[in-house]
Amino acid sequence: MYKNLLFTLLIMAGMQFLSSCAGCSDSGKKSQGDALTLPDSLISDAPLRLSEEIMNEVIGNISSPVEMAGLFKNSGVDFTQRILNNPDNVSRYETSYQRALNLGVYSADLGYINTFDKNNIVVSYLLAVKNLADGIRVGQFFDFNALRRMASSSTNLDSLMEMSQTSFNKMDSYLREQNRSNVSSLIVTGAWVEGMYIASNIVRESGDKELSDRIAEQKNVVNILEIILSNYASDAGFAELVQSVEDLKAAYAPVRITTELGEPQRIEKDGSLIFIQAEVSTVHYSPEDLENIMATIENIRAKIVN
């Protein structure tokens, strides 16, 4: 589920740099999460321009916060619908910008709902997703009638989420193939913000250390989001969103992530034995740092859903 990422970004006139993963564990355990690391020389106030091809690769490599759903349940905190975006809010979202952002929000909510097997409210969230997808002309990727039938039985929830995820993947691929990566980037951002918002609420209630680390390690993802969104700063709504991400980047500034080489791992691939260099990563932050990050995330989320 959590995989190490190593990919090359070509920026400006063919400049190359590597973005590698950094996990999160103050105890020095092997990385369990994805974090995309930028060299300090490329993290500046000036926006970097990415080609459409590279934008597609970056967006595709940012892990959806839906993948954090297992940590939500492991925290021991009971399911709370009040922290999710109310499906009735769909009528508020009248622009493509709002619809794309909140399509991401509801996708993260669905992951949280599925984790706790709350099939009694799944349909209303699927309907919200369908309405927003129709609003940005990608509703053809969601067979709502089939999804609704599957949602009527708790025994079908795994298949339901698999089908939903397949629909989202097809939709994302279509958007990027149609040179609508600006829309795809909004969906990714909305999903990421909602996942961090849910995680923040759970941390406030439980103090869960693993989730706290997961929030803190997202510093590198924020750097990537800033680059992605800055490419569309001239589009309606994006300038304000970029400013919000810059505020979040400032909140993450005190967080440090250090990485050391661990023992190589042996795996078999295509009949051959290969070695993969493991990494041991540690995230360093104070309770005050975490509180400031969570407060900033909550502020951004409020702007998106209201």
Label the predicted regions.
Residues S31-R149:
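N-terminal Sec/ER secretory leader and immediately downstream segment
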Residues F17-G23:
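C-terminal motif of bacterial Sec signal peptides marking the signal peptidase cleavage site
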